[in-house]
A protein has these predicted regions:
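Active-site proximal beta-strand in glycosyltransferases
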Residues: 2, 88, 104-120, 137, ...
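Proline-aspartate-enriched helix->loop->beta-strand connector
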Residues: 81, 85-86
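Short His-centered aromatic/hydrophobic patch
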Residues: 91-97, 116
């Protein structure tokens, strides 16, 4: 099984891909692949280290569309797939979703799944570019084995508002987070924060 994400910067996709890699049954072997953070972005590789996950870094995969770097990234992903021979390729977010699924289709990977962590179908680009990205996602979704939405609202947007794919192809799986560290020393931490901001015990925050 191979997980492919845009890049290892702070955000939901890193946590999601890390947890899927770290906590999957020992019966399965998982390879995590992703691009590196861009200048000004916070690095999230410490999250992988915290859970004992090693990743294959893909410097060729950049945030913005670029014909030359995208072509290099696609070639590299294909090489990784051919060497690793995964039964499943699971991609996360737009850039990794496009390049990862294209590579998986070209390499005849049996199962190809994509998770939407957001989308760019409104408020990001002009009409022409938005139409193009929507068309690309529709074509990729047709060939994907399954699509994962992280909320019911997102599923509604993908299937009804923007018609990326049919409802039958989408499963809703909310992002999972490790909440244990927030449960530790809860009373002590609560008092510390309230003292810091001079809040009374009964004040609602």
């Amino acid at each position: 099984r191979e997980e492919i994400i845009n890049r290892f910067n702070i955000g939901g996709p890193t946590y999601n891909a890390t947890f899927l890699t770290a906590f999957l049954s020992d019966k399965f072997e998982t390879l995590l692949v992703g691009g590196i953070p861009e200048k000004g972005e916070a690095d999230s590789l410490h999250i992988l280290e915290e859970y004992g996950v090693k990743a294959t870094l893909l410097p060729e995969m950049k945030r913005k569309p670029n014909f030359f770097s995208d072509k290099k990234a696609l070639k590299k992903i294909k090489e990784i797939i051919k060497e690793y021979k995964p039964d499943i390729v699971h991609t996360h977010a737009s850039k990794a979703g496009a390049l990862g699924r294209k590579a998986a289709f070209d390499c005849s990977v049996p199962i190809v799944v994509h998770t939407f962590h957001g989308h760019v179908f409104h408020s990001y680009f002009g009409k022409a570019k938005t139409f193009l990205f929507r068309f690309i996602e529709q074509q990729l979704a047709k060939r994907s084995t399954g699509i994962i939405a992280i909320s019911e609202i997102q599923k509604q947007e993908l299937t009804e508002a923007y018609k990326i794919c049919s409802k039958s192809k989408v499963k809703v799986i909310p992002l999972g987070f490790d909440l244990e560290k927030f449960r530790q020393n809860k009373t002590e931490n609560r008092k510390k924060i309230r003292d810091q901001y001079k809040l009374n015990d009964e004040d609602v925050v």
